[in-house]
Amino acid sequence: ESHTEIVKQVLNELKLDQLILSGHSWGGLVALDLSTQYKNEMTLCMNIAYPFLVGDILLDYAKGNLDQAVEFLMKYGIYKMPETEIKTTGFGVKGSGFYGRSKGEIKSPYGTKTVENDPEREIKLYPLKRLFNQTEKEISSIDLKSCTNFRLKDNQIKNLRNVKFLFCDKDKLARYNPENELLINANHEKDIFILEETGHFPYFEDPDQLEMVFKKIFS
């Protein structure tokens, strides 16, 4: 709820209209909550579960060891690697080419990490993993706990309107459940979109398929 309030304050200052609210995973819950409190044209919730129950192991990792938490999310969240490596700009070099590789060691701007199993995989995951960087240790822990505790009121669920839901058929973290109470007012043919052969991070795994779905939704 506090995250929703912050977004509302920002939107009030910006004085925007004809808003389309969107969020992925935890951010999708914020967008959903916001959609019941702030005027909008449409809300798009990507890869959300409700209730979004986060396991104790992940919560413990997020509190004490962010690397372990991110590894957990990568292990269960990713179904496939993108065919084309995502290019990012950083430290004056494009892509992940700035890495140094030798005998399983990966040298990144954040230090040297030894990866015994698959250093190439670690390199390909870098553009996604860098999204989880945080300035304070507790950020991920707080966010994940808020997922577990988040609930909409009954009247909010009944009043959900013009909400589009995007799921991925190989997502182990936020599975599509046609019986979910959030989908009571949804038209399952027009409001629910399912990406094929994709896990929890479609913008990383299959951006082309995601773009096609976006075009269907927004056209």
Per-region residue spans from a language model:
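Conserved loop-alpha-helix segment in the C-terminal half of the alpha/beta-hydrolase fold
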Residues: 159-198
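Conserved alpha/beta-hydrolase catalytic His-Asp/Glu region
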Residues: 60-158
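Residue-level signal for the nucleotide or nucleotide-sugar donor/cofactor binding architecture
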Residues: 2, 135, 174, 205
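Conserved donor sugar-nucleotide recognition element shared by glycan-biosynthetic enzymes
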Residues: 3-4, 66, 203
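Active-site loop/oxyanion-hole signature of alpha/beta-hydrolase fold enzymes
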Residues: 1-22, 208, 212
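Conserved hydrolase catalytic core segment
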Residues: 16-54
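A short beta-to-alpha transition loop/helix N-cap that caps and shapes the active-site region
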Residues: 49-58, 70, 80-81, 173
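Catalytic active-site module of serine/aspartate enzymes centered on a nucleophile-bearing elbow/loop
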Residues: 188-219
